[in-house]
């Protein structure tokens, strides 16, 4: 087999894998629309989507299940892509928004905005609300930015190894968690209920306004990462190789980390902490299709959407009518994966 034929086969396998994920995402979305306390048939779902459904079915589809599905897709894409890019930029397979402390920094910023400025809270009925989603997003981004800046400064000034950067991320996570607990200590009962509930990654709280904001951040971020795909491939080959190919490595790392932080911040501000999606998805995709970022970025996005949607559907149905926060399930999945990767790294050493 000559080189052009090998390249066609190489590309064809990746495209087929992407198509399989698209089909899986579509079927999972239909299934998620049908299952729940209020079970629906496919015909009822289609009629509601076409505008011909009954009022009660329309309410369930458009106000409850569709927002949840779109939140899962957008959040899964955002976290998976952020994780894939961070693993490249930091040259560490353990890097992700969760393990680097970015999620906890965003959580601290969001809680600070909720308590100190009253941008969100809880009603006596238990319903969580957001008064100003834009300001909460800004504060969440600022919290994440603090963690990113500290880690990058330590890496630059002290020449941290990839392993030490993960430890720095763990330290920042602990610091932000302590800050969040301090804020909780001075909160009243309703504010405390809102903050504790916020720490659970839950897609059920998403509303259309927040989904539009998440999509408005995710789409241009994904476009930017695809635009920089060749630079990321060069970085995978090594620092000196990337520089010899004309890549401004410091600028690429800085902007990549900032965009990944913004993606994470928006998701945390509206949905809470959903851990390990950014760690699991890029690794599984890399095993299946390799490390070419031309394909790794979009297929990681699809895989993240599928994983989070299936996990959320499972969380809604496993002990129905009780709905588990999806962040609990992703942590159960991600923690063993994290330990496996950690042991694998130290075996190489």
From Swiss-Prot:
Q: Where in the cell is it found?
A: Cell membrane
Give the family per the record: Belongs to the binding-protein-dependent transport system permease family. FecCD subfamily.
The upper taxonomy is: Archaea, Methanobacteriati, Methanobacteriota, Methanomada group, Methanococci
For this UniProt record, give its keywords in alphabetical order, as a comma-separated list. Cell membrane, Membrane, Transmembrane, Transmembrane helix, Transport
| Keyword Transmembrane appears in the UniProt entry | yes
Q: Which PANTHER family match?
A: ABC TRANSPORTER PERMEASE PROTEIN MJ0876-RELATED, FERRIC ENTEROBACTIN TRANSPORT SYSTEM PERMEASE PROTEIN
Superkingdom is: Archaea
Give the organism the record lists: Methanocaldococcus jannaschii (strain ATCC 43067 / DSM 2661 / JAL-1 / JCM 10045 / NBRC 100440) (Methanococcus jannaschii)
* Positions of transmembrane segments: 15-35, 69-89, 100-120, 135-155, 166-186, 206-226, 254-274, 295-315, 318-338
Q: Which GO terms describe its cellular component?
A: plasma membrane
Membrane topology recorded in Swiss-Prot or TrEMBL? Multi-pass membrane protein
Mind listing the GO biological process terms from this record? siderophore-dependent iron import into cell
UniProt xrefs under Pfam families: FecCD
The record's function comment reads: Probably part of a binding-protein-dependent transport system. Probably responsible for the translocation of the substrate across the membrane.
Which InterPro entries does the record associate with it? ABC_BtuC-like (IPR037294), ABC_transptr_permease_BtuC (IPR000522)
Q: Which residues form a coiled coil?
A: none
**What is the name attached to this protein's record?**
Putative ABC transporter permease protein MJ0087
Q: Could you state a single Gene Ontology molecular function term?
A: transmembrane transporter activity
